[in-house]
Curated annotation (Swiss-Prot):
It catalyses: Transfers a segment of a (1->4)-alpha-D-glucan chain to a primary hydroxy group in a similar glucan chain. Belongs to the glycosyl hydrolase 13 family. GlgB subfamily. It comes from Bordetella pertussis (strain Tohama I / ATCC BAA-589 / NCTC 13251). Transmembrane segments: none annotated. This is 1,4-alpha-glucan branching enzyme GlgB.
Length: 731
């Protein structure tokens, strides 16, 4: 809107002209656009490289603006009255043609002051709707509004395809005290590439991608993209209404973890579109309930697998457009599958176009490297003590859950957030205000995050990757916990894989590695993870961890999966594990699908499908996952034979799992059972349908009134080597 500038009489002093043309003027609205000069209205336009500029009134009257210096134009415009922001348009002659546009400096502030205040106070959860690039219509003029939080910057301009990436042309307005820079650019629409040119507090000018960009270029390009804001046509209303019940602790949850870039190679086609056509049906056919994706957020380095993201609001462009990702989620829901995303609020890379020193100061990160530099990954650590940073991160989480209908977030590297001395030697970390190692600000952030998700995204879940014994990770915030819904059981995973790697002849000496997990199984609500981390960096594949020849390896992997699926806790399996990938995972190559030409690998895949089916349909295997009454040891101390037997129960059903972790058959093996009567074999991992040799027990066994293991009834059977059996009581 035009404003009175009594000190300006139709010309600018030399210092102001120089600052404008040098790209150093911090308050462009004070000099550009329409201004009152006595009884007249003066219009000034900064258009370096333009040949001529005219102001055109609605009636067609044209007034040429005269160059004060090359690129800086000014004139009195007869007939132009105050108070009408879009009362004229500009006709600019460039070397390559004529441009007709409204003057961005003829418009008043475009961001709502109350929303800015709310945002500054940390209460704005939909930050992606306020900052970044948004289609807008101002006073009947269509365009894009840009906004960036950079409170310490001396000047900010938006640059892009629309202005030849010339940082002089579109300097932004500072909305004080929020520290937000804004500008409405007429005629800029979806697909336009842009960045922010920031003159920082340190005096350096840098180009930064938009932290709130909802679309970005594919690496190695680094620009942000004005998104297409047409709403996606979701078809998942029924799923969204049911998902809370599908994700409760008494529901069966079996997660298929996927790296979108290497699950299948579709010869250059848009990856989300092709994944949507293949992956949901595949995961559904194997009985999984959820797909968990390694981070899909925009990230500059593919070798990070997405765990060093810079675009916390934008899907990675390498896999397709944002609408393609929404389509993928919609197809998953159509197939009855939830979608969980890995999400990384623990750290970010220091790429020059990213968040690092965004306004010439350590804005998102800590200034002191003892707090702000991660020693393991050489990345920067978010300053959780800063209200605006917490708001930014929580807004990212809410954005994925609401805008993309995602059903849960697996929060990466929580342990590194909780401890100030994580991976740091003495003297290289700063204690908290109590002189201790706990990161109090990170604790508060995680609690605030989980509380916000619970309020803003009903039915969505959060899962912590937390590898220590921090108490109360899944306890409610009101009870002093962190408020997560689930926690990865890293201890169970490490103990049991260590056991399975051992030569079977030595396993008797390490029996506790299998049983110890039940000591703390109900301390949290757990997910049992066989994740991507266990099949990289020289660790080999899951199949390769099993000792012996190939047939023995497959038999042991079948046994291990059956043990896992019967054990309390939700399940997670990384892609390729379902059919026994032989090689270590390579993010640059697709899975070894050709292995499914081998009946033994097809058998393993069939077992995973059957385990998921049994797990989902037998309530005793899932409904008391968080209740100690749902589990009872029967044989927990037979280390000499490396045999375990335990019961999973609910109010009406009982299933007993018996596992032999050596190749030695145990003929006439007797174990107690809680009930008299018939017990039917529901799973036999040695069956020929799974690639085993067969020869297991009959399909139905009847208990005998012979006491064993504290029970008045018992079963006796010939227990094959490297075999797990599920026996269910027949009511």
């Amino acid at each position: 809107m035009m404003r009175d500038s009594p000190s300006i009489q139709g010309t600018l002093d030399a210092a102001t002209q120089h600052a404008l043309l040098a790209g150093r003027h911090a308050d462009p609205f004070s000099v550009l656009g329409p201004h009152q000069a006595g009884a007249h209205t003066v219009v000034r336009v900064l258009a370096p490289g333009a040949r001529t500029v005219m102001a055109v009134l609605p009636g067609g009257q044209r007034t040429p603006l005269l160059p004060m210096q090359p690129g800086l134009f000014e004139n009195t415009v007869p007939g132009l009255q105050p108070g009408a922001p879009a009362a004229y348009r500009l006709c600019i002659e460039w070397e390559g043609g004529i441009q007709h546009t409204a003057d961005p400096y003829a418009f008043g502030p475009v961001l709502d002051a109350a929303q800015l205040d709310h945002c500054a106070a940390g209460g704005w959860r939909y930050l992606a709707g306020l900052l970044g690039a948004h289609a807008a219509s101002v006073d009947g003029c269509a365009g894009t509004r840009f906004a960036l939080w950079a409170p310490n910057a001396r000047r900010v301009a938006v640059v892009g395809d629309f202005n030849g990436w010339d940082g002089r042309r579109h300097a932004m307005r500072l909305r004080y005290p929020a520290g937000v820079w804004e500008l409405f650019l007429p005629d800029v629409g979806p697909g336009a590439r842009y960045k922010f040119q920031v003159l920082g507090a340190d005096g350096h000018t840098v180009l930064k991608a938009d932290p709130l960009a909802r679309q970005a270029e594919a690496p190695p390009a680094t620009a942000s993209i004005v998104p297409d804001e047409r709403p996606f046509a979701w078809t998942d209303k029924a799923w969204m209404e049911q998902r809370a019940a599908r994700q409760r602790c008494d529901a069966p949850i079996s997660i298929y973890e996927v790296h979108a870039g290497s699950w299948f190679d579709d010869a250059g086609a848009p990856r989300w579109q092709n994944l949507a056509a293949r992956l949901p049906e595949y995961a559904r056919s194997l009985g999984f309930t959820h797909i968990e994706l390694l981070p899909v957020m925009a990230h500059p380095f593919g070798g990070s697998w997405g765990y060093q993201p810079l675009g916390l609001f934008a899907p990675a462009a390498a896999h397709g457009a944002p609408a393609d990702f929404a389509h993928f989620v919609d197809r998953c829901h159509e197939a009855g599958l939830g979608v969980i995303l890995d999400w990384v609020p623990a750290h970010f890379p220091d790429d020059a176009h990213g968040l690092a020193r965004l306004d010439g100061t350590p804005l998102y990160e800590h200034a002191d490297p003892r707090e702000g530099r991660h020693p393991d990954w050489n990345t920067l650590i978010y300053n959780y003590g800063r209200r605006e940073v917490r708001t930014f991160l929580i807004a990212s989480a809410i954005h994925w859950l609401r805008h993309y209908h995602v059903d849960g977030l697996r929060v990466d590297a929580v342990a590194s957030m909780l401890y100030r001395d994580y991976s740091r030697p003495a003297g290289q970390w700063i204690p908290n205000r109590h002189g201790r190692r706990e990161n109090l600000e990170a604790i508060d952030f995680l609690r605030e995050l989980n509380a916000a998700v619970g309020v803003q995204c009903p039915g969505a879940i959060t899962v912590a990757e937390e590898s220590t014994a921090w108490p109360g990770v899944t306890a409610p915030v009101a009870n002093g916990g962190l408020g997560f819904d689930y926690k990865w059981n890293m201890g169970w995973m490490h103990d049991t894989l260590r056991y399975m790697r051992r030569d079977p002849i030595h396993r008797r000496h390490h029996h506790h590695d299998l049983s110890f997990g039940m000591v703390y199984a109900y301390a949290e609500r757990f997910v049992l993870p066989l994740s991507h981390d266990e099949v990289v960096h020289g660790k080999g594949s899951l199949l390769g961890k099993m000792p012996g020849e190939r047939a023995a390896q497959l038999a042991q992997l079948r046994l291990y999966y059956a043990f896992m699926w019967a054990h309390p806790g939700k399940k997670l399996l990384f892609m390729g594990g379902e059919f026994g990938q032989q090689g270590e995972w390579n993010h640059d190559a697709m899975l070894q699908w050709s292995l499914l030409d081998d009946p033994a690998h097809r058998g393993l895949q069939r077992l995973v499908a059957d385990l998921n089916h049994v797990y989902a349909t037998l309530p005793e295997l899932h409904c008391r996952d968080a209740d100690p009454s749902g589990f009872a040891w029967i044989v927990g101390d037979d280390a000499d034979n490396s045999v375990l037997a335990f019961a999973r129960v609910d109010a009406s059903h009982c299933l007993v799992a018996v596992c032999n972790f050596t190749p030695v058959p145990r003929p006439g093996y007797r174990f107690g059972v809680p009930h008299a009567g018939d017990w039917r074999v529901r799973v036999d991992t040695g069956a020929t349908r799974y690639g085993g040799a067969g020869g297991g027990p009959p399909i139905c066994l009847r208990s005998e009134p012979i006491p064993a293991h504290g029970h008045p009834q018992s079963l006796v059977l010939d227990l094959p080597g490297f075999t797990a059996l599920y026996l269910r009581h027949s009511e």
